[in-house]
């Protein structure tokens, strides 16, 4: 098996990862003389800021996803391949993937980050992350299925376990999913589940630090905490989760909370490249790059977004924030630098610009910070809607999301409360199992 892309005479740029950063590079190379190959394990781009709305059954997964091939269908020198990265061999300018190997002139690593369980294997096994569309759909099924089962279960203890929701992580994802589930409890349960007392549903938000939204100002943290408490969310600060057993989330102080809906959004970790030398890894095992996003010591390999860290920026000594705006800015700068390389011009250094931070917890409840301006309430919420709507790919998706938001706003009703358990065809199951055992590099390179 191979990627089946003829090399030709053009310089080839291989991009691994079609998130915000990778897509920005690919779009920025339009009209250039480069051959571009985009590799991603999915055949679509997903919009992470709205994944929590899929998880809460408030939005269709297709509304925040966009097929790569549609985005690039008019590009002659662009190729997409659905595959996973296995290893890189810079000395041979070779990339190993789950479907074979491919040569490159320039390589861009933009695979982003994954959920960080901080080495806790038991929590990793039982907790439900919310980083991808697939994970959000799985979480949606779990939430709805647990509510259904709570009506027919045999004991009060089991019912409480099914209706308790524990969210670990007080960042933007944590406060957003806690807020939207609280709204679901207040508006959906009384309408759809007449034989269920909504007050039995408890939502817990656990944060190891001393405040929510630690990346924002104390004022925004206080505002969000006030909103959530008013919405009935139980907030536990300075509490660390150590384990999950017997349907209980166990805290460091020995206390526990019974639940069968255990959501983990407590940080991210950079995607790892299995054979990359440890010398290239920095804080948080992010790949060290210079001010041009070039991996130190590897002139033709670049890394952008959540996967990389630029050390030495006095304004961000621990690295730039792992946010969409960072990946977009780095991707844009790198695309421009590839154009400059083609013309023999010097590269421009990357300089991060903080465009602001926002978080929403529910209808008319949000916080936003832009430079010295801090907002909360309706206008922050409205600004959040506008910014995210503009960022979604595709006119159809923008229209669908806007109409969905309008419907939910005026009717207090989410219409997607259906449980789907997709069954993969045997051919697909066999192929996935086969690809997990093959194409790991060294054996294939020797052939």
Residue spans for each PLM region:
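FAD-binding core/adjacent interface of flavoenzyme oxidoreductases
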Residues: 1-12, 78-166, 263
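Beta1-alpha1 glycine-rich phosphate/pyrophosphate-binding loop at the start
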Residues: 2-81, 172-215, 263, 446-447
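Glycine-rich, N-terminal phosphate-binding loop of Rossmann-like dinucleotide-binding domains
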Residues: 18, 99, 111-112, 253, ...
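A Rossmann-like FAD-binding core segment of flavoenzymes
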Residues: 76-87, 182-291, 295-297, 347
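Short glycine-rich anion-binding loops that position phosphate/pyrophosphate groups of nucleotides
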Residues: 112-115, 178, 268-270
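FAD-site-proximal beta/loop scaffold in flavoenzymes
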Residues: 125-156, 247-250, 256-329
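Rossmann-like dinucleotide-binding core of oxidoreductases
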Residues: 159-216, 223, 234-236, 321-349, ...
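C-terminal, flexible cofactor-proximal segment of oxidoreductases
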Residues: 326, 330, 335-447
């Amino acid at each position: 098996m191979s990627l089946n892309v003829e090399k030709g005479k053009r310089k080839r740029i291989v991009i691994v990862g079609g998130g915000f950063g990778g897509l920005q590079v690919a779009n920025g190379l339009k009209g250039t003389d480069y051959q571009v190959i985009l590799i991603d394990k999915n055949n679509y781009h997903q919009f992470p800021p709205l994944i929590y709305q899929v998880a809460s059954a408030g939005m269709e997964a297709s509304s925040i996803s966009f097929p790569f091939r549609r985005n690039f269908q008019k590009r002659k020198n662009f190729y997409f391949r659905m595959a996973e990265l296995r290893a890189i061999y810079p000395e041979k300018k070779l990339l190993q993937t789950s479907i074979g190997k491919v040569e490159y002139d320039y390589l861009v690593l933009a695979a982003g980050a994954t959920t960080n369980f901080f080495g806790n294997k038991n929590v990793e096994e039982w907790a439900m992350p919310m980083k991808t569309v697939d994970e959000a759909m799985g979480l949606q099924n779990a939430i709805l299925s647990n509510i259904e089962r709570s009506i027919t279960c045999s004991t009060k203890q089991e019912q409480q376990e099914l209706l308790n929701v524990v969210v670990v992580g007080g960042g933007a994802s944590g406060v957003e999913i806690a807020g939207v589930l609280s709204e679901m409890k207040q508006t959906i349960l009384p309408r759809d589940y007449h034989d269920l007392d909504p007050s039995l549903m408890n939502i817990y938000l656990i944060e190891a630090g001393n405040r929510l939204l630690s990346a924002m100002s104390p004022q925004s943290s206080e505002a969000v905490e006030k909103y959530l408490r008013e919405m009935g969310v139980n907030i536990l600060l300075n509490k660390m989760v150590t384990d999950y057993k017997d349907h209980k989330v166990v805290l460091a102080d020995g206390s526990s909370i019974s639940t069968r809906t255990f959501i983990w959004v407590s940080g991210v970790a950079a995607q790892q490249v299995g054979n990359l030398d440890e010398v290239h890894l920095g804080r948080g095992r992010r790949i060290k790059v210079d001010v041009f996003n070039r991996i130190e010591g590897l002139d033709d390999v670049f890394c952008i977004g959540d996967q990389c860290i630029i050390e030495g920026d006095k304004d961000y000594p621990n690295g730039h924030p792992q946010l969409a705006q960072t990946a977009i800015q780095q991707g844009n700068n790198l695309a421009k630098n590839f154009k400059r390389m083609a013309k023999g011009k010097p590269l421009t250094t990357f300089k991060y610009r903080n465009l602001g931070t926002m978080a929403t917890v529910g209808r008319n409840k949000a916080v936003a910070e832009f430079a010295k301006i801090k907002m909360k309430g309706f206008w922050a919420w409205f600004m959040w809607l506008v910014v995210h709507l503009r960022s979604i790919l595709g006119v159809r998706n923008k229209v669908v999301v806007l109409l969905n938001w309008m419907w939910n706003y005026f009717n207090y009703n989410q219409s997607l409360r259906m449980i789907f358990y997709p069954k993969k065809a045997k051919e697909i199951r066999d192929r996935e199992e086969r690809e997990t055992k093959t194409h790991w590099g060294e054996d294939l390179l020797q052939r």
